[in-house]
Amino acid sequence: MVTDASDRHGSPVYARIYAVVKKIPRGKVATYGQIAALTGMPRHARQAGYALAATPESLKIPWHRVINAQGRVSLRLRHWDSGSDDLQRILLESEGVVFDGNGRVNLEKFRWNPKSVHS
């Protein structure tokens, strides 16, 4: 049985990503690149994306709060959640995140800016 992310993936990398994503408050977003940098892996945005795409539902990770650098919901294929692109937008909007007419979030307004991920 999988008890945490490091057990599932054989390394602590996904666990570090999940720990940072858990800190994103309601009504804020972070980018994949931002999450990668905050976990000590600058320029590894795709690794953050892979980790979130593989998130077991049981971990209760707020994966929906992570978007791409253009402020958009990235297309994803989640094994347990068909329609997750629409779901991601719905969840963000329910938390007060606003999308413009082009489907973008204003990152200057809604980006999470932590002082430290260790606090």
Where are the regions that the model predicts?
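Nucleic acid-binding interface residues in structured DNA/RNA-binding domains
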Residues: 2-119
